[in-house]
């Protein structure tokens, strides 16, 4: 079994599995639907179009739903094995890392995949338009996602929690729901993937544009000799980190300018092998702080980084002056 060369190669395999899942849903939906819309003369998506998009090399053969389910299970097993092997060989897979960072279940990760698909291949716009019987629909709805992912009505109803305000998908801003009007039911709302999550999954390493004015990602030194700390201070920090490494911890580093606070922050991050998302705290003044803090937290989780707020004292001074 080969490892993945990169995260994009893995996404291609994920899309093949998605095609099988959509094929299963398509076969179960029957051939009665077709996407058309008054005022869009000449635009029409047929069942044959969808079948060709899902299996362009498919020969004329009968595939049962049970065979499709087995195919999906086999694809999932191969994906897990190749991802595991890739990590062992030193190739991280961003789609898997997203699941780990935000504790996503496989159904939630599949919801991400369905929302991501139109960003990677325009054929999914046509497939979703057909399945929703609306030529203007380019993205999946909550209802369609749940139908594709669920085998029974009970599963479908239970899966609504994946799109509740407290769910990882919504609470961390991974997906966005788009109601046409305030009273549109959740099931009818279209789903898109947050733009920065799309960028991350497709290989971009930049910090999210919404926080780029006041946050930057910095790699931590890999060797203690790269730091300018006294041996006693380094030993104390090592002991402190060792006692708290398994728990989310806030370290407050204080002292006058030049006392080594920045070096201490680098040492803490280096001791756990993580980069730092460094925030210029005074520049947060005047922002919607709750929203910004949520975005910073998401970015730190996405990048597996320590969140470091610098120049906090300057913000206190601004408040005093105000």
Language-model regions, residue ranges each:
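Intrinsically disordered, low-complexity N-terminal extensions of AAA+/P-loop NTPases
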Residues: 1-322
């Amino acid at each position: 079994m080969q490892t993945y060369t990169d995260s994009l190669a893995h996404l291609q395999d994920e899309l093949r599995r998605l095609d099988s899942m959509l094929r299963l849903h398509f076969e179960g939906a029957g051939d009665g639907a077709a996407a058309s819309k008054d005022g869009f003369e000449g635009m029409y998506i047929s069942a044959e179009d969808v079948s060709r998009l899902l299996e362009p090399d498919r020969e004329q053969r009968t595939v049962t739903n049970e065979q499709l389910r087995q195919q999906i299970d086999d694809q999932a097993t191969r994906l897990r094995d190749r991802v595991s092997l890739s990590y062992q060989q030193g190739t991280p897979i961003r789609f898997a890392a997203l699941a780990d960072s935000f504790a996503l279940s496989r159904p939630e990760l599949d919801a991400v995949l369905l929302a991501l698909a139109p960003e990677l291949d325009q054929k999914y716009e046509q497939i979703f338009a057909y399945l929703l019987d609306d030529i203007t629909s380019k993205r999946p709805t909550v209802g369609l996602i749940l139908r594709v992912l669920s085998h029974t009505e009970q599963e479908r109803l239970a899966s609504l929690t994946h799109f509740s305000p407290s769910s990882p998908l919504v609470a961390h801003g991974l997906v966005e729901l788009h109601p046409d009007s305030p009273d549109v039911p959740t099931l009818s709302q279209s789903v898109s993937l947050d733009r920065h999550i799309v960028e991350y999954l497709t290989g971009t390493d930049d910090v999210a544009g919404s926080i780029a004015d006041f946050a930057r990602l910095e790699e931590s030194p890999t060797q203690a000799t790269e730091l300018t700390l006294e041996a006693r201070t380094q030993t104390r920090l090592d002991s402190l980190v060792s006692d708290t490494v398994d728990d989310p911890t806030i370290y407050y580093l204080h002292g006058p300018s030049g006392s080594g606070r920045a070096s201490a922050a680098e040492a803490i991050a280096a001791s756990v092998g993580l980069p730092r998302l460094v925030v210029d705290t005074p520049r947060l003044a005047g922002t919607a702080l709750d929203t910004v803090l949520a975005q910073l937290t998401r970015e730190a989780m996405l990048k597996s980084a320590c969140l470091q707020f610098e120049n906090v004292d300057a913000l206190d001074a601004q408040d005093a002056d105000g």
